[in-house]
Curated annotation (Swiss-Prot):
NCBIfam families registered for this protein in UniProt: ilvD, PRK12448.1
GO molecular function: 2 iron, 2 sulfur cluster binding; dihydroxy-acid dehydratase activity; magnesium ion binding
GO biological process: isoleucine biosynthetic process; L-valine biosynthetic process
The organism's taxonomic lineage, starting at the top: Bacteria, Pseudomonadati, Pseudomonadota, Gammaproteobacteria, Pseudomonadales
Family label: Belongs to the IlvD/Edd family.
Pathway stated in the Swiss-Prot or TrEMBL entry: Amino-acid biosynthesis; L-isoleucine biosynthesis; L-isoleucine from 2-oxobutanoate: step 3/4; Amino-acid biosynthesis; L-valine biosynthesis; L-valine from pyruvate: step 3/4
PROSITE patterns in UniProt: ILVD_EDD_1, ILVD_EDD_2
Organism annotation: Pseudomonas fluorescens (strain ATCC BAA-477 / NRRL B-23932 / Pf-5)
The protein's name: Dihydroxy-acid dehydratase
Catalytic residues (positions): S515
Record has Nucleus as a keyword: no
Entry cofactors: [2Fe-2S] cluster; Mg(2+)
Co-factor binding details: Binds 1 [2Fe-2S] cluster per subunit. This cluster acts as a Lewis acid cofactor.
Gene: ilvD
Reaction(s) this enzyme catalyzes, per UniProt: (2R)-2,3-dihydroxy-3-methylbutanoate = 3-methyl-2-oxobutanoate + H2O; (2R,3R)-2,3-dihydroxy-3-methylpentanoate = (S)-3-methyl-2-oxopentanoate + H2O
Length: 613
């Protein structure tokens, strides 16, 4: 049986000094015989998805100690992508993922912790903690802060979210009063933004990976039911410690739970629910940390036969995360996928021996357990608040309509192919990604003229100045992981295209990425990126580009000979923007850019370069 890692700092005469310091934190003699469990919290008052987490770490800590463990809490950073968007703050968003992963590794390894509870929620925090968990490979469980309630206003017939506020603000025909009403109504409570944006997508995927409890991705941050998820996480992590350290059961380790098949399950769910394209970036990064050979080709393969079973904002205005929960949450989507033969159900999870057992217990269409049905009736209260577990509202009934409801069966899918696709061609030799769930079928094949912008800022200026016309393909380059640096999200350009009435009349291609709130023919993650010598850096204004989603292709309609000649010239000039960009690239960002790989590798650090040092 493996020894507790913590024995390194708690046992032996030579550790008297370390024990003295542990005692100063409150530990007693008996505590040195127990597992020391790290609680990686991410409370911050900057982010609505994290503003309510302050006391939740100690809630989990008390439950860990009741169950026989020793809990020690620390915090990571958390960047709000929505607040950082539209200025140089967005340069820091993706790099913060690596900082979060490193900080968890640093704290856990420096103090020899035996296990981790990851309290995450928003865009880069869940991925960063996931990367750390797979790096460390010690018992772990994820419990996130939960989604925000959808906003309500008399001016809209549907629930509101952050994207609605951004789009209406960019609409010159909207009055200041209407804009203000949307702004005040779009984000009414604590929690991660209410649609299937990046944060909620990632928290749902932790369920599919087997590293979180059922309901983690869909139970509202404000609902009292979410408290039990935190308490149960505290009890479960102690059980996982006992199984690993006491019973030598390696099946509880994250790399044995989140193995290749589990990554296929997570991606299958992502495609079926029309998740954010950012999830692809983060799953690829997490797979690299786990030393799993899971790449864009695997995602491409899955995307061709997994149907879309769920449509949620921003892909449709009718449904938000609260509606997904009412329809049975993630385990109901997993149940439909399993019935369609599209899921590996023989894999272990942190809460059940196999995924099949978990589905049987938690899929509302399979179980008659009234407690489970009661759990998924948890709904929104419609009361603005920043307090967790502050309401206990319940729907009168569940949405178990698998023909026309929020979650569909395979037979009644929204589309036979899922909500994400990988495209290849001469403009993206290593692939690029499009969220097909948000693309109107009328423009699944689109040929247009390239309109080049060498930064997001210049693209925004060009769109607002009406430089972009119907039929154009907006190309924003040198915004990749290395070229940005930091791979900015392009939510403002896509929102402004919508506000100009060009949402279905134009396309956008970038080596940057998109917010989970993006919809329309928006293609990101073009790899290799321009700064790494990618073909996207060779496109010229007016070049024809053909996008063909059904055939998974994207090509610059320029001869190979012409491209070769352009490459020779670009090599002489250097792969950098032609125009000067008024952005301050600090030492921290330069360090990130130096090691960053392109998006097809998850924008992780270039380990081959590091190994050569």
């Amino acid at each position: 049986m493996p020894d507790y890692r913590s024995k390194t700092s708690t046992h032996g005469r030579n550790m008297a000094g370390a024990r003295a310091l542990w005692r100063a934190t409150g530990m007693k003699d008996d505590d040195f015989k127990k597992p020391i469990i790290a609680i990686a919290n991410s409370f911050t008052q900057f982010v609505p998805g994290h503003v309510h987490l302050k006391d939740l770490g100690q809630l989990v800590a008390r439950e860990i100690e009741r169950a026989g463990g020793v809990a020690k809490e620390f915090n990571t950073i958390a960047v709000d992508d929505g607040i950082a968007m539209g200025h140089d703050g967005m340069l820091y968003s993706l790099p913060s993922r690596e900082i979060i992963a490193d900080s968890v590794e640093y704290m856990v390894n420096a103090h020899c912790a035996d296990a981790i509870v990851c309290i995450s929620n928003c865009d880069k925090i869940t991925p960063g903690m996931l990367m750390a968990a797979l790096r460390l490979n010690i018992p772990v469980i994820f419990v996130s802060g939960g989604p925000m309630e959808a906003g309500k206003t008399k001016l809209a017939s549907h629930g509101l979210d952050l994207v609605d506020a951004m789009v209406i603000a960019a609409d010159s025909s909207a009055s200041d009063e209407k804009v203000a009403e949307y702004e005040r109504s779009a984000c009414p409570t604590c929690g991660s933004c209410s649609g299937m944006f990046t944060a909620n997508s990632m928290n749902c995927l932790t369920e599919a990976l087997g590293l979180a409890l059922p309901g983690n991705g869909s139970t509202l941050a404000t609902h009292s039911d979410r408290e039990e998820l935190f308490l149960r996480a505290g009890r479960t992590i102690v059980e996982l410690c006992q199984r690993y350290y006491g019973d030598n059961d390696e099946s509880v380790l994250p790399r044995n739970i989140a193995n290749f098949k589990a990554f296929e399950n997570a991606m299958t769910l992502d495609i079926a629910m029309g998740g954010s394209t950012n999830t692809i970036l983060h799953l690829l990064a997490a797979a690299q940390e786990a030393e799993i050979d899971f790449d864009l080709r695997d995602i491409d393969r899955l995307s061709r036969h997994v149907p879309q079973l769920c449509k949620v904002a921003p892909n449709i205005q009718k449904y938000h995360m609260e509606d997904v929960h009412r329809a049975g949450g993630i385990f109901s989507i997993l149940g439909e996928l399993a019935r369609g033969g599209l899921l590996h159900t023989d894999l272990p999870t942190v809460h059940s021996k196999t995924m099949a057992e978990g589905i049987a217990q938690w899929d509302i269409t399979q179980t008659s357990d009234e407690a489970v049905h009661h759990f998924f009736k948890a709904g929104p209260a419609g009361i603005p608040t920043q307090t967790a577990f502050s309401q206990s509202t319940r729907w009168d009934s569940l949405d178990d309509d698998r023909e026309n409801g929020c979650i569909r069966s395979v037979e009644h899918a929204y589309s036979k192919e899922g909500g994400l696709a990988v495209l290849y061609g001469n403009i993206a030799l290593d692939g690029c990604v499009v969220k097909t769930a948000g693309v109107d079928e009328s423009i699944h094949v689109f040929e247009g003229n390239a309109k080049i912008f060498e930064s997001q800022d210049s693209a925004v200026r060009g769109i607002l100045a009406d430089e972009v016309k119907e039929g154009d393909i907006v190309i924003i380059r040198y915004e990749g992981p290395k070229g940005g640096p930091g791979m900015q999200e392009m939510l403002y350009p896509t929102s402004y295209l919508k506000s100009k009435g060009l949402g279905k009349a134009c396309a956008l291609l970038t080596d940057g990425r998109f917010s989970g709130g993006t919809s329309g023919l928006s293609i990101g993650h073009a790899s290799p990126e321009a700064a790494a010598g990618g073909t996207i850096g060779l496109v010229q204004d007016g070049d024809k580009v053909l996008i063909d989603i059904p055939n998974r292709s994207i090509n610059l309609l320029v001869s190979d000979e012409e491209l070769a000649a352009r490459r020779v010239e670009q090599d002489k000039k250097g792969w950098k923007p032609v125009e000067a960009r008024p952005r301050k690239v600090t030492t921290a960002l330069k360090a990130y850019a130096l090691l960053a790989t392109s998006a097809d590798k998850g924008a992780v650090r270039n380990k081959a370069m590091l190994d050569g040092l």
